[in-house]
UniProtKB/Swiss-Prot annotation:
Species: Bradyrhizobium sp. (strain BTAi1 / ATCC BAA-1182)
Compartments in which it is found: Cytoplasm
Positions bound to substrate: N12, W13, K14, G175, S214, G235, G236
Entry's Gene Ontology molecular function annotations: triose-phosphate isomerase activity
UniProt function note: Involved in the gluconeogenesis. Catalyzes stereospecifically the conversion of dihydroxyacetone phosphate (DHAP) to D-glyceraldehyde-3-phosphate (G3P).
Protein name, as recorded: Triosephosphate isomerase
Subunit comment: Homodimer.
A Pfam family of this chain: TIM
Keyword match Hydrolase: no
Catalytic activity: D-glyceraldehyde 3-phosphate = dihydroxyacetone phosphate
EC number, UniProt record: 5.3.1.1
Length: 251
């Protein structure tokens, strides 16, 4: 882990969670004091739970609440979509954009991710921009080229350490139980760091780079010890307070 960058453990609940799941979030709030010296915590529930979670967290500063996606426009005739401004109004402090499941399920391009990132900033929030390669791209030896292209096109020129976090999520590792080796993660995060510094200079040196892809309590400490890994984007393991907090303790 890069020592001067405070780590972030971000939980992406994806399309999981009903009102009864508030109990898990309350348990996270209750246990957060044990890890606040190690990392910042962020939970991104489905939009139906966002405002309720934000109300629970208000005044504690123990766990921040975020969103999983937004529309690029501030308002308009976009049935079923939510703007960054709406999510900010509901209590979000950050929004995930460009997750591989959005790219795959909804055909979101790097250009769309770029537009959504700017929308997140327009609402005064932090953008967590996801990049990563598929198994086919990995097998073809295209990982670095794919990441370079995604970063160049997805990240707007105004990116700073304060308004942007990058999340590397190898698509082949998401929800599969598979994870790259610590050496692989180190090489890829070093590559991402180099690209960020080349483009954004000192800001790029201070940006958080999260690792995402089957992060769980049993492998968190090893992954978080890797250079240029400044936290994690956690999927399934973030649904349980005990697992989520255990991952944060690995920082």
């Amino acid at each position: 882990m890069t020592d001067h960058i405070r780590p972030l453990i971000a939980g992406n609940w994806k399309m999981n969670g009903l009102k009864a799941s508030t109990a898990e979030f309350e348990a996270m709030l209750a246990g957060a004091a044990e890890v606040t010296g190690k990392a910042d915590l962020l939970v991104c529930p489905p939009a139906t739970l966002l405002a309720g979670f934000a109300d629970k967290a208000r005044g504690t500063r123990a766990v921040a609440v975020g969103a999983q996606d937004c529309h690029a426009k501030a308002s308009g005739a976009h049935t079923g979509d939510l703007s960054a401004e709406m999510l900010a109004d509901a209590g979000a402090s950050a929004i995930i954009v460009g997750h591989s499941e959005r790219r795959a399920d909804h055909g979101e391009s790097d250009v769309v991710v770029h537009q959504k990132t700017e929308a997140v900033w327009r609402a005064g929030l932090v953008a967590i921009v996801c990049v990563g390669e598929t198994q086919q791209q990995r097998d073809a030896g295209q990982t670095l080229d794919i990441l370079r292209g995604q970063l160049n096109l997805s990240l707007p020129q105004g990116s700073t350490a304060a308004n942007l976090t990058v999340a590397y999520e190898p698509v082949w590792a998401i929800g599969t139980g598979l994870t790259p080796t610590a050496k692989d993660v180190e090489q890829i995060h070093a590559f991402i760091r180099t690209l960020l510094i080349e483009r954004f200079n000192g800001e790029g040196a201070r940006m958080r780079i999260l690792y995402g892809g089957s992060v769980k309590p049993s492998n968190a400490a090893e992954l978080m010890a890797v250079a240029n890994v400044n936290g994690a984007l956690v999927g399934g393991a973030s649904l349980k307070a005990a697992d989520f907090l255990a991952i944060a303790k690995g920082c």
